[in-house]
UniProtKB/Swiss-Prot annotation:
Keyword Disulfide bond set for record: no
InterPro entries: PSII_PsbM (IPR007826), PSII_PsbM_sf (IPR037269)
UniProtKB keywords: Chloroplast, Membrane, Photosynthesis, Photosystem II, Plastid, Reaction center, Thylakoid, Transmembrane, Transmembrane helix
Database matches in SUPFAM superfamilies: Photosystem II reaction center protein M, PsbM
Source organism: Tupiella akineta
Membrane topology note: Single-pass membrane protein
Lineage: Eukaryota, Viridiplantae, Chlorophyta, Ulvophyceae, OUU clade
Family from the record: Belongs to the PsbM family.
Protein name: Photosystem II reaction center protein M
Chain's role: One of the components of the core complex of photosystem II (PSII). PSII is a light-driven water:plastoquinone oxidoreductase that uses light energy to abstract electrons from H(2)O, generating O(2) and a proton gradient subsequently used for ATP formation. It consists of a core antenna complex that captures photons, and an electron transfer chain that converts photonic excitation into a charge separation. This subunit is found at the monomer-monomer interface.
Gene Ontology cellular component list: chloroplast thylakoid membrane; photosystem II
Single biological process term from Gene Ontology: photosynthesis, light reaction
Record localization: Plastid, Chloroplast thylakoid membrane
Assembly with partners or alone: PSII is composed of 1 copy each of membrane proteins PsbA, PsbB, PsbC, PsbD, PsbE, PsbF, PsbH, PsbI, PsbJ, PsbK, PsbL, PsbM, PsbT, PsbX, PsbY, PsbZ, Psb30/Ycf12, at least 3 peripheral proteins of the oxygen-evolving complex and a large number of cofactors. It forms dimeric complexes.
Transmembrane portions of the chain: 5-25
Amino acid sequence: MEVNILGLMAVALFILIPTSFLLILYVKTASSSD
């Protein structure tokens, strides 16, 4: 179970990091457009 939890956390970070980066770019673009 511990391995599965660590794997899940790794996947979560792998998804959240690029997602947060894209969100920041989107917010900057929206602000520039406005």
